[in-house]
Amino acid sequence: MTAPVQWRTFFHQCLIHRIDASEFRNLSKLLFQKCPIAESALLDALLQTRSESRIKWDPLLPLYIDCLCRMGRVRTSTVLTSLLKYSSIHDKPQLPTSEGKDGSKCYTLMTDIRVIQDAMLSVSTGSTPKTNAEAIAIFFAIIDWIHAVASWHNSHFDPGQHSSGMMSSPDVVSLFESLGILLAALSGTGKGLEVLSADSHEGLKVKLGQALSAYLPLCVEVSLPLRNRLDGLQKEFNLYGERAPKSLDVPMMENMNVNALQFEASVMDGPVINSRAGLYVFINAMLVGRPLVDDSMLINYLANRYGGHYEALIEEILTAAFDVLSNGMYRNESSRTMFVFRSFLVNKLPAFFAAMLASTMVSIPMEMCISHALSRLDPNTFPSFSQMFEMQGNTVLSDVRQEFLFACASHKLIPESSIERLLGENPMQTLPVGYNKDELVSQINANPERAEQLINEIESMEGNAGAIIGAITEVMHNLCNQKETMTLKNICNSLSRRPQALDVVLIFRNPKQVLQPLCALLDSWHWDEDQGEYQPVYDEFGSILLLVLAFKYRFDLRPADLGISSNDSFVLRLLERGTCSQKLDALDEKQNKNLGSWIAALFIAEGISEETMSACSPQEFYLLVATLFSQSLEACETGKLEFDTLKGGFEYLLEPFLLPSLIFALTWLGDHIWETELDPSIPLKALQSLVNPSSISGEAREIHRTVLNITARTLEEQLKDVRTRHPSRTDIKPILDSLEPCLSFQLVGSSHRSELESWTTHSGGGLLGGIRSTFQSLVLWSTNPEVSMAPPPYTHRQLIAGVRMLGASRVLPPLIEELKLQTEAGNGPLALDLAATLICAPMAETFSVEQNSHQPVDPNKEALPRCGILTLRDVLALQHENVPKISEKDPLRAEVLVRLYRRVNALLAPPSQVPNLDVNNIIQNMQLGGVGVGVGAGQMELDAAGAADHGVGPDDAENIHRMIDNAAAAAALDSSGTGLDTSIDDVLNAADMAVGNPEFLDLDMEGMF
């Protein structure tokens, strides 16, 4: 029996008997003594065995390959080369007529991904390469792999399909990403840098440039951070697939590149400390304006921050949420802001914890975590029921601890009996009934009135808001699909008149999830001129549109946030042009006819007839409202129409079925009053009659209040400006008084005038000095994280104001300077975490772009989201490019920049895309001794002498069978003897189990350099 046959038999038996890594090492050492074999032949034997089994994914194969690498029997470059030779990445797309002909072909991509990720780990930890020759060999292997994946993409690409080529296969995407990270990691090693910096490897650099030219265009859809890293590598070493021109400047440039990389490599990271202020700032940023809560982004951020340390994660996010509430009370934040803080703590966090724990296999002592968090709170802010009577101060938050604990019990996080222990006294309420989303959907389907009852409960603090919102949004989606607009109208009306309910909705759903189906329904609204009654149709259309507009104006949403993807969208046209009047000669024949009919109905006839509405769809009507007002008001101002007639006609718009159109009418009217140089008396009288009508029905009153909520802020600014120009006018103040209760509708994170004045007049340098002062107080507070003390005053509005008013390029340098000073003072790790958090904290302007990195949109269906401002992270990246120059003048500042850049990228590193895996089975396999993910160095050195008596001869297949059988029997008898080293398991758990991909290592790319 030849050596390859011997080894194939050995591998086959190991796979059949599920021999673990340590036993495999022990047995293979014996066979190496009896039957030496070259590394390429050895890998051929193993991979041929895999091909014969035709198993799509066997976790033992990567373990065996990793074991052979650790034993020094095979090199990483040879592994990658052999792996490619047998990979199914070479498969061509099958024609329908050839179906079944390749049935014996083995699918290898899942194994390929894992082996390449093991190579990533080996490279990133410095285990390989040890020589320049090995680095060159690995570079060439990666180049071949990249070309193979690019070829697969091209052969599977169909321009007529939305998802074709690489994006049609999640496994190919994951393989593609892993290759890029491996290349980035290798380029950052000492040997990799030496190879790329040397003049003697021009051929390699040409081939590498060609591979990068094929890789980078595809990388845009997979990972922008990875693309940026490799793009920087391409620029640093001029890797463009062509031989560099001979120039005296080239060596200098190369030396400068090497110096830059060498400086960065010389910067050592200090200990990573998760400061108490970090999450305090992050949660404040999420909730200070429009709620910027996305579960996948939050989980990813927390996983990057805490790894697999769930207890610390839960304890610290709880502490931070209570700290944010405490700070809000001391700062006298508005009741609506306090409501959002409170709902996040009571409604969101228990549901978030329950979902997170359900997806893990880790047992977490929730009661202990909660107890630790509560012990760190300021007792004066969250008093017990008995203390409440002794305190003379504000006890607005006295019920919060109870509400939170009962919500936790409702979500089965803690038993109800533990509430008394955690409170230290008898609770003053009882356990609320927990809701289930699917049951609520069934209840609403059976009784549509149940929806309004549930919407009334969204603002309750019982932990049920998530289930209610999930049910309501699902029902709304179904109603949109079924075009059941009557029931949908009632739900939309219930939501639009409850602004705080909209806030809670965004804590659990992003705007697009809620509004995209509504916008699609409005865009495709079917209008039948022969359908009978038309007023109910206008009523239903207006109610749905009003909810969309309430969301849009409360949170200052852009069209992309609403889920609008088509330039032909009615909603988009209405938002862009609905408040602009048109000249009569710009209207087409149909619009002219409709305009005449509506003018006649409002001012000449005795009401709006069915005939008027039947000839004009709601979409056409809303686009004509501004023109209708313009023509009517002009007729009144020129004496062609009496004001009482004008007023009476406009009052028809106060009917519920037309009231939402008043948003566009009032906006146009406010613009007209502000722009006109004529006497504004008539427009002001018209505005007064619409803002404060003499009579209005009960049903219409709620809609009218929502209309004023949406328009009040802009009208107030315009009217105050007009009053400045006409100080003697007395007809403006009554309108302003009517608008005043509606001025606080928007929730966009803008600063109050008094806040802005206090920050800009800060004695230590204006707004930037105020930001530095805030930074200092947060660092000081974090130096004693266990002390039960109130947090320092903080609102993320200050940083937002700085970025919006001064620009991120002026805000970041003072933060870096403060970080440098704190580092010199010995608070470097704390200050670094805080500065990184300020940069990572979500902002409304960038939120959709950040969401797209976690849930990418289909660029064939909708436009990619764009960021309209330069962010702190953008400025940090630009500063990081100047590190070589900065290091010459200010080495400490350069070091601080490097550490901050690494920390930010580590916190925001996107999750690895590894779909199509049975995670439960993988986790179960990881816990079995036979499928360990790594073997410690000490346990690798097993004594094989005891097994030598089996006498494996070069031609004795029976000896191999017997040796395997004995090893399997021994493993079955003594499960403690598996020889697994848990250190590698711990590393993998920390890096991966938190994001649900335990078998596939998602390495932090930034930490490799």
UniProtKB/Swiss-Prot annotation:
Quaternary structure, from the entry: Component of the Mediator complex.
Origin species: Neosartorya fischeri (strain ATCC 1020 / DSM 3700 / CBS 544.65 / FGSC A1164 / JCM 1740 / NRRL 181 / WB 181) (Aspergillus fischerianus)
The family assignment reads: Belongs to the Mediator complex subunit 5 family.
What Gene Ontology terms describe what this protein does at the molecular function level?
A: transcription coregulator activity
Q: Report the function annotation for this chain.
A: Component of the Mediator complex, a coactivator involved in the regulated transcription of nearly all RNA polymerase II-dependent genes. Mediator functions as a bridge to convey information from gene-specific regulatory proteins to the basal RNA polymerase II transcription machinery. Mediator is recruited to promoters by direct interactions with regulatory proteins and serves as a scaffold for the assembly of a functional preinitiation complex with RNA polymerase II and the general transcription factors.
**One BP annotation, GO:** regulation of transcription by RNA polymerase II
Under the heading InterPro entries, the entry gives: Mediator_Med5_fun
Name recorded for this polypeptide = Mediator of RNA polymerase II transcription subunit 5
Q: Which GO terms describe its cellular component?
A: mediator complex
User: Which keywords describe this protein according to UniProt?
Assistant: Activator, Nucleus, Transcription, Transcription regulation
Key word Transcription regulation present in the record? yes
